[in-house]
Curated annotation (Swiss-Prot):
Highest taxon, organism lineage: Eukaryota
Key word Transmembrane present: yes
Mod. after translation: Autopalmitoylated.
Localization in the cell: Endoplasmic reticulum membrane
Primary gene name: ERF2
Taxonomy of the source species: Eukaryota, Fungi, Dikarya, Ascomycota, Saccharomycotina
Function: The ERF2-SHR5 complex is a palmitoyltransferase specific for Ras proteins. Palmitoylates RAS2, which is required for its proper plasma membrane localization.
Gene Ontology cellular component terms for the protein in this record: cortical endoplasmic reticulum; endoplasmic reticulum; endoplasmic reticulum membrane; endoplasmic reticulum palmitoyltransferase complex; Golgi apparatus; perinuclear endoplasmic reticulum
Location, primary (coarse class): endoplasmic reticulum
Topology with respect to the bilayer: Multi-pass membrane protein
The protein's name: Palmitoyltransferase ERF2
């Protein structure tokens, strides 16, 4: 009798779920889930990726998977967004009109400011909300022993053959969290809870990883921020110099001048560092591993080493970075997937060999 009652309860709950998905309430629910997807739905085995990806990652999706961010992290990216938008608003209200109607042809500087500002904002959004190169989960599943024990050989590094005996060895490693053999230069991000191709670092300012598919947008964002600050500084300096009443009559110009001068340096230092790294085909993780330090690599003495990925010249390396295809999105948030797709399944955590031995 208990078994029959359980079956009837399950059938009733299933029918209720089907009714919910076919009623008017389901349309509202689906709309809000499309608008903001905070948690994945365990009851839905198929559908778009943005519905299932939150089950196996720390991502939050917006507008049907078109934008993403990481939950649980400090919202520093909101401060960066305000730092981009607020100067443009103040410049548009108090400065643009006066510079536009001068006799000496300062319209070009106004146009340049808005042009580089748009590039800065667009590249920031692209860097912060796009797929950095997330690798699919549960591709290389081993036959787990008792108590979900991973075989010991899965904790070994595999060295790949290279065409050069001078450069360092290329190794691949098994990720017990994502359960895949990671490709070279890939790494697991504990903040996002995903493995990322050509993982450079997790940037707290954009709340996203910087990897193969968004590194170029990150560089464009830094360059756009630098040029926008320089042009804003120039425009405000011209306004102050041309003001007949002195600096007291243009307080907003002085405010923007100080702001542009202060916000120029950090992006400039960061951009210089990453240009050197990209020009040598080296990631931040590889650089930190080479110097054996976890400190801020921007202020560390540069140590140039042999690199199998180096194309031989700065221009070739930069061209390879900026012009090569970004590669496919292996775990697309907008494409549908079928029921039983293991890439979107949150499997029981496997224990390490060492942990089992202690037990």
């Amino acid at each position: 009798m208990a078994l029959v009652s359980r079956r009837s309860t399950r059938s009733e709950s299933t029918s209720i779920t089907k009714e919910e998905h076919t009623g008017e309430g389901s349309l509202t629910k689906l709309f809000f889930r499309w608008l903001v997807t905070l948690e994945g739905d365990q009851d839905i085995n198929d559908g778009k990726g943005y519905i299932s990806l939150p089950n196996v990652s720390n991502y939050i999706f917006f507008l049907g998977g078109r934008f993403r961010t990481v939950k649980g992290a400090k919202p520093l990216w909101l401060g960066v967004l305000l730092a981009i938008v607020c100067p443009m608003v103040l410049f548009s209200i108090f400065e643009a009109h006066k510079l536009w109607h001068t006799q000496n042809g300062y319209k070009v500087l106004v146009i340049f400011f808005y042009y580089f500002w748009v590039i800065t904002l667009a590249s920031f959004i692209r860097t912060a909300t796009s797929d950095p190169g997330v690798l699919p989960r549960n591709i290389h599943l081993s036959q787990l022993r008792n108590n979900y024990q991973i075989p010991q050989e899965y904790y070994n590094l595999i060295t790949l053959p290279t065409h050069s005996s001078i450069s360092k060895d290329i190794t691949i490693k098994y990720c017990p969290s994502c359960r895949i053999w990671r490709p070279p230069r890939s790494s697991h991000c504990s903040t996002c809870n995903v493995c990322v191709m050509v993982h450079d670092h997790h940037c707290i300012w954009v709340n996203n990883c910087i990897g193969k598919r968004n590194y170029r947008f990150f560089l464009i964002f830094l360059l756009g921020a630098i040029l926008s600050s320089v042009i804003l500084l120039t425009n405000c300096a011209i306004h102050i110099a041309r003001e007949s009443g002195g600096p007291r009559d243009c307080p907003v110009a002085i405010l923007l001048l100080c702001y542009a001068g202060l916000t120029l340096w950090y992006p400039a230092i960061l951009f210089t560092y990453h240009i050197f790294m990209a020009g040598n085909q080296q990631t931040t993780r590889e650089f930190l591993k080479g110097i054996g330090s976890k400190k801020n690599p921007v202020f560390h003495r540069v140590v140039k080493e042999e690199n199998i990925y180096n194309k031989g010249s700065f221009l070739k390396n930069m061209g390879h970075l900026m012009l090569e295809p970004r590669g496919p999105s292996f775990v697309s948030a907008r494409k549908p997937h079928e029921a039983g797709d293991w890439r979107f399944m949150d499997l029981s955590p496997a224990h390490s060999f060492e942990k089992i031995q202690k037990i």
